[in-house]
Amino acid sequence: MEDSFLQSFGRLSLQPQQQQQRQRPPRPPPRGTPPRRHSFRKHLYLLRGLPGSGKTTLARQLQHDFPRALIFSTDDFFFREDGAYEFNPDFLEEAHEWNQKRARKAMRNGISPIIIDNTNLHAWEMKPYAVMALENNYEVIFREPDTRWKFNVQELARRNIHGVSREKIHRMKERYEHDVTFHSVLHAEKPSRMNRNQDRNNALPSNNARYWNSYTEFPNRRAHGGFTNESSYHRRGGCHHGY
């Protein structure tokens, strides 16, 4: 009986099961799923926060920590060459498209990290950047200022540098979307033009802030979709090298 047992044992294969039976290949990830975290080598920081909450200070700190970082803000569109800030809500959508174009160019050139310094109240406002990140293999990192007053309307009205009134900041706070994720941003839907116009009107600065009244008052660099000197320009806190 012992000999029979040894013969049966000898016929058993000690090879791993995967060599006896061919394994099925793993299923591909669902379409629109970003690569696994370990595969990311480039980073996109999407800053969020109400006016005066400390976004620009946070952007500068990130740039200090990552000297190669580039900061892109839609606000840059409304800075004149002499450094004066003049806001025109009629060109807000164009300004966002202009900023997205700069960010896309930087991503295609492999710049990392890239920092988007915008209010980004709604998930859909960040969607173009999330799509770019997916297409160019960037990890998206959402950051908000960690200031104690970031939702204190009275303090925000006092601190913001563009003259946004307390009432408008209060309305912005009411619409602020919390707990956004990459997937919620990627699948967010852009609202109708009517709702966007309402948001645009709520973004108007207070009466003591300067703004352009007509397209003809824009500097030529704006009319042609960019700065006169495309090679380099300065903004608050850094140089963007033409992006």
Curated annotation (Swiss-Prot):
It holds the Pfam family AAA_33. The keyword Transport does not apply. SUPFAM superfamilies: P-loop containing nucleoside triphosphate hydrolases (SSF52540). Keywords: Developmental protein. It comes from the Eukaryota. Transmembrane segments: none annotated. The keyword Metal-binding does not apply. Disulfide bonds: none annotated. Residues 1-38 are annotated as: Disordered. Induction: Up-regulated by USF1. Up-regulated by FOXO1. Might play a role in adipocyte differentiation and triglyceride accumulation. Interacts with dynactin subunit proteins, including DCTN4, DCTN5 and DCTN5. This is NEDD4-binding protein 2-like 1. It comes from Homo sapiens.
